[in-house]
Design a protein with these regions (language model features):
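Patatin-like phospholipase
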Residues: 1-8, 16-258
């Protein structure tokens, strides 16, 4: 078993489940129970839709004004959904409530949108730490703590390698960031800005991955984070990536020990 785990965003949930249970089979079944139980229905369809186009001029005008109303509403809201919805999901997935109950020490990252700094949690309320690290900006309302507004740990540290540096002898990074980009169907201001931000994030994640001793990076393509319907396929993809790398990982560990 690893001597310490660090997790950001989805990695905080997976890491906490493993650190608590040490049982990958239980984790997989727990997620299947979550999906089949309908708890994810509360999140709705969070996939980012492409550009909408109406065949009529009046439809285009109506969409023009609708988009501007949405922009005005967004300027006055912290998120589309209250973070209590994701808290319910995290509470269902985690078998323990505090860091002290974990079988492996863990560090969970969140991001303070006031300062842009990563906030590291390693004690106290485990559920709250995972909720903060999983709070997708704009989708869920951020957590308020003192003067901080805390959101997804992946914003400041998508791959929390720095959180483990100096604390362990060997860092194995599990990178589930996009491995490719789909061709843009339409070129417009929104799609170009979004694509540029995606590219920036991909390159920053690679920079963090370069700081690890070994990296396993499953080929998830351009899969959106909300594609829960692809659960079985993504599990298979992750397992195949690990199996393909396991001999190289063992050889690297042996070389360093020798």
């Amino acid at each position: 078993y690893p001597t310490m785990i660090a997790g950001s965003s989805a990695g905080s949930t997976i890491g906490a489940m493993y650190a608590a249970s040490l049982d990958p089979d239980w984790m997989e079944n727990r997620f299947k129970d979550l999906i089949s139980g309908g708890k994810l229905a509360a999140l709705g369809d969070m996939q980012v839709a492409g550009e909408r186009e109406s065949s009529s001029i009046w439809g285009q005008v109506a969409q023009f004004f609708k988009d501007r109303v949405e922009i005005i509403l967004a300027m006055n809201k912290l998120g589309l959904m209250d973070s209590k919805k994701i808290r319910e999901i995290i509470e269902f997935l985690l078998p323990v409530k505090t860091f002290a109950e974990l079988q492996i020490p863990m560090i969970i990252t969140a991001t303070d949108v006031q300062t842009g700094q990563a906030v590291l949690h390693d004690s106290g309320d485990l559920v709250e730490a995972v909720v903060q690290s999983s709070t997708v900006p704009g989708i869920f309302t951020p957590a308020k703590k003192d003067d901080m507004y805390l959101v997804d740990g992946g914003a400041a540290m998508p791959l929390p390698v720095p959180a483990l540096q100096g604390k362990v002898d060997y860092i194995l990074a599990l990178d589930i960031s996009k491995t490719g980009l789909n061709k843009l169907d339409r070129y417009n201001m929104y799609s170009i800005i979004t694509r540029a931000e995606t590219i920036r994030g991909m390159h920053y994640t690679r920079t963090l991955a370069d700081q690890a001793d070994f990296v396993i990076h499953p080929d998830v393509g351009d899969t959106h984070w909300s594609r829960f319907d692809l659960f079985d396929q993504l599990i298979k993809t992750g397992r195949q990536a690990a199996e393909q790398q396991i001999d190289l990982l063992k050889a690297d560990l042996s070389r360093r020990k020798g």
